[in-house]
């Protein structure tokens, strides 16, 4: 029996832009086999969508609380929905 798949919509606040947070998120997602995307928002936050096995998505969300080496994360907000079948993991502009 395969693990249940999930989709997480994530917003990360703090010093998360200009510190390679998006690229590090992409790399962390690929290491875990998580699909989705990540982008900077005009208000200084980072937004991401993660899809994959629950344990892999949960691991990536936990990673988001620390993020890239130069990041300083103050908050991670997550909501869950049904997966939509995203392919790959991309940085959106």
UniProtKB/Swiss-Prot annotation:
Is Cytoplasm a UniProt keyword of this protein? no
Q: SUPFAM superfamilies, per this entry?
A: Acylphosphatase/BLUF domain-like
Enzyme Commission number? 3.6.1.7
Q: Which GO terms describe its molecular function?
A: acylphosphatase activity
Annotated active site: 22, 40
**Per the similarity annotation, which family is this?**
Belongs to the acylphosphatase family.
Task: Supply the name of the protein.
Answer: Acylphosphatase
* Origin species: Haloquadratum walsbyi (strain DSM 16790 / HBSQ001)
